[in-house]
Amino acid sequence: REETAPLQILDELRSAGAYLRRVVLAHLDRTVFNRDALQEIAETGAYLSYDLFGNYPSGFYPHNPAVHLLNDAGRVTDIGWMIERGWTQQILISHDIAQAFRLAKWGGHGYHYILAEIVPLMRMRGISEEEVGQIMIGNPRALLTFVAPRDNPA
């Protein structure tokens, strides 16, 4: 929950010999608000995960009340900014459905939320079909494809 934590984590992983292009930094949309810091993270090659879509629409974050979270429109704006800088192949998105109350059955936004609400918003904001496809299909596929250790340079 500290804005410097992602870079500290990446430094530790790098010093341990990790291949940073296989690392996902989750919850960046609630941790990193400074675009210079986001750029520094992106330049490592790690995946940039904005995974709180549909969560905390008021911007209030109970785990750190001093932070005012982005809403979904702000998240999409940040994603557009990342795309403009050439980081499309590093972007991951999700909605962090970890509790029953987030399911549609219990009044939450549900699993369909990204396809029903966020993808159309991305298109309205000028994110191309190719870029949406890369974020929704290409990047998860690349991340989840096993890589033989000999093909995984440190």
Protein language model regions, located:
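Short acidic/histidine-rich active-site segments
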Residues: 50-52, 86-108
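Acidic (Asp/Glu)-rich catalytic clusters
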Residues: 11-18, 38-45, 82-88
